[in-house]
Amino acid sequence: MTELARLKFYATQPHTCSYLPEEQATTLFLDPSQPMDVQVYADLSDMGFRRSGDHLYRPHCQNCSACVPARIPVNLFIPDRQQKRILKRNVDIQVQSAKPAFTQEYFDLYQRYIEQRHADGDMFPPSQEQFSTFLVRDLPFSRFYEFRVDQRLLAVAVTDLLPNGLSAVYTFYEPDEERRSLGRYAILWQIAEAARLQLQAVYLGYWIKNCKKMNYKTQYRPIELLTNQRWVTLY
């Protein structure tokens, strides 16, 4: 365990929550001058932190605790009937690892995804600068997992490879390929990849009970939720 007590953290001013607009959110950030050390990152992930661009953060809201860190314990996971169908439906997909970079192919896919799936969110409208700042960081543990069929790019899972697991940073995919359930397939693939690498978990970020867009996370069972500084398993 790293000496986390020596790290400095800063809190933002309260602002409107992007998930629950009726709530005021505060975010706790690791000191940006702190080098992005992979072991520090792993230890903070176990405490509910996430990465966005060059920053490690977690919610630190005074009057709300709706954002619950979630992870999938890889060795315990068993796909259900629907998930097995998704795996079978995508058996033709080839996955390869790439270094994070800006390419027109990546951005075009990202742009279609944001415009068709998240036009009501704070990432709309998408821009090249936003894409690069958010996802294209020169970090040794960051990967762009490309999902392709006959060289056609269908999805990119931006994933951090940590000593204790895979952290699913962000996934964007072809919005017209609804039948494939590419977002769910990407998570299933990451679970299998974490198992292959003999890692402990896949970190999914935050689950919010009253946010429809987050409901998919609890469809992967068992799932572990960080509650009162302790990971609790739900079967």
From Swiss-Prot:
| Class of the enzyme per the UniProt entry, highest EC level | transferase
Q: Keyword Coiled coil, does the record have it?
A: no
Q: Which reaction does it catalyse?
A: N-terminal L-glutamyl-[protein] + L-leucyl-tRNA(Leu) = N-terminal L-leucyl-L-glutamyl-[protein] + tRNA(Leu) + H(+); N-terminal L-aspartyl-[protein] + L-leucyl-tRNA(Leu) = N-terminal L-leucyl-L-aspartyl-[protein] + tRNA(Leu) + H(+)
**Keyword presence, Metal-binding:** no
- One matching Pfam family: ATE_N
- Which UniProt keywords are listed? Acyltransferase, Cytoplasm, Transferase
Organism superkingdom = Bacteria
What protein does this entry describe? Aspartate/glutamate leucyltransferase
Write down the species. Answer: Pseudomonas syringae pv. syringae (strain B728a)
Q: What's the encoding gene here?
A: bpt
